[in-house]
Design a protein with these regions (language model features):
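Acceptor-binding helix/loop patch of EC 2.4 sugar-transfer enzymes
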Residues: 8, 74-100, 143-176, 236
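N-terminal subdomain of nucleotide-sugar transferases
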Residues: 1-64
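Conserved catalytic-core segment of nucleotide-activated headgroup transferases in glycan assembly
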Residues: 210, 215-279, 289-293
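Conserved small/polar residues in nucleotide/adenosyl-binding loops
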Residues: 377-384
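Conserved acidic donor-binding segment of nucleotide-sugar-dependent glycosyltransferases
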Residues: 347-353, 362-367
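Donor nucleotide-sugar binding/catalytic pocket of nucleotide-sugar-dependent glycosyltransferases
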Residues: 143, 151, 168-175, 179-220
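Acidic donor-binding loop of glycosyltransferase active sites
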Residues: 300-314, 325-327
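Short hydrophobic beta-strand element within catalytic cores of glycosyltransferases
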Residues: 318-321, 328-332
């Protein structure tokens, strides 16, 4: 069986949860089936990572599509799509609700690989790749990995603030288009049973299975007490749920924590926009942006993890990282969605600012609350992986 996977970006280095999930999956699957991988490269400097990726995936045929070499005219459909998206996001400050458009050269590139490598199954991942189902020949089976239901993410965003009627009707259109596109696939795979049930109730007739992203469990990691007054968040500002959640936390929770303990520090790991970093470090005390780190265990050791996610869907790799490294965590109902961790026993779940702050402060001073939940969740994660 020859399997083609298309991603919306190069999965290396694994600088965010999405890339971690895709990279870890490829590392495992390369030993099981014949895999071909296609992803776009938008800037020439990204090709510097190509050799490193191929070294990590020696059994995978890797075909980068070099967007920077295939420039379209300003009047092309793809160029107009990119311009429209930039205007909507950066100038109007609104969620982008139009259907993705692909380059002619990219569509031809994918179909040529399907023909040349005699592909049997095409697996598209992430919303950016969803509508490629209409460009792929019917001679192959089509699978979609639904990491996040876009229309659910938008609906949760609309609950936080008012948007114009035009934005809301566009969101309704996107919901219908997303469901229709999913129905063109032979198989849909969600990250959680919750997302699976949502899609089934909302009219997705294609077969759906739930399977979380794979994450390797490191060896020789032991529990350490949170001796420092430090909390940590993992994720970049490019993913809107991260930016939304961290902003909410800084605006509503951080001052409550510092009021009780002014020595607390907040470390953010991941790529963040430089303007946002400058603005937030001027506005908030004891805030540190760490960027991408090679040794995650060293940075988050003895830290309390916070996952203040309010919008989006899917599974939070941040929580799985916390479990991996024995880090106690405080999260929201949306943040822990799809993971059956028990509030008060395995973590603290809080949706209100005061309750969230209280949860962080309680973990910081209660050694039993630090040790028992993380030890239990780590053991359960190992048992679950052993059963897969």
């Amino acid at each position: 069986m020859r399997y083609l996977i298309t991603l919306p970006w190069m999965p290396y280095p694994a600088t965010d949860g999405g890339k971690q999930g895709s990279f870890n999956m490829l590392m495992e699957l390369q030993n099981m089936i014949d895999i071909t991988l296609i992803y776009p490269v938008f800037f020439k400097k990204q090709m510097a990572c190509q050799y490193l990726l191929e070294k990590q995936l020696p059994k995978v045929k890797v075909y980068p599509f070099e967007y920077y070499k295939n420039k379209d005219g300003i009047k092309s459909q793809y160029s107009l799509f990119r311009l429209h998206r930039i205007i909507t996001r950066k100038f109007l400050k609104q969620p982008y609700l139009a259907t993705p458009i692909y380059k002619d050269a990219y569509i031809d590139f994918v179909n040529e690989i399907i023909k040349k490598d005699r592909i049997d199954i095409v697996q598209n991942e992430y919303f950016e790749q969803l509508y490629m189902v209409y460009a792929i020949p019917n001679t192959v089976k089509k699978v979609f990995i639904q990491h996040e239901i876009q229309y659910i993410a938008k609906e949760r965003l609309f609950q936080q603030r008012e948007y114009p009627s035009s934005v809301r009707y566009l969101a309704t259109m996107q919901r219908i288009q997303e469901i229709n596109a999913l129905n063109e696939y032979d198989q849909v795979i969600t990250m959680t049973d919750i997302d699976k049930n949502i899609l089934m109730c909302d009219g997705v007739r294609a077969p759906i299975s739930a399977s979380p992203s794979f994450i390797p469990l490191p060896d020789n990691i032991a529990y350490k007490e949170c001796e420092r007054s430090s909390i940590c968040f993992i994720g970049g500002s490019g993913h809107n749920p991260n930016l939304n959640g961290v902003t909410w936390f800084l605006d509503n929770v951080w001052s409550l924590i510092l009021k009780e303990n002014p020595n607390f520090t907040f470390k953010i790991i991941g790529k963040w926009d430089e303007k946002i970093k400058t603005e937030y470090q001027k506005k908030y005390r004891n805030l540190f942006f760490c960027g991408f780190v090679d040794n995650l265990a060293m940075v988050i050791s003895e830290c309390i993890m916070v996952i203040p996610i309010l919008i989006g869907s899917g599974i939070r790799m941040k929580i799985l990282e916390s479990v991996n490294f024995y880090s106690p965590f405080v999260t929201t109902t949306v943040g822990v969605e799809g993971l059956d961790f028990i509030n008060g026993k395995e973590c603290i779940i809080a949706d209100e600012p005061q309750a969230f702050a209280t949860g962080v402060l309680k973990i910081a001073t209660d050694k039993v609350l630090q040790h028992n939940p993380v030890s239990y969740t780590h053991l359960r994660a190992h048992e679950t992986c052993a059963d897969l």
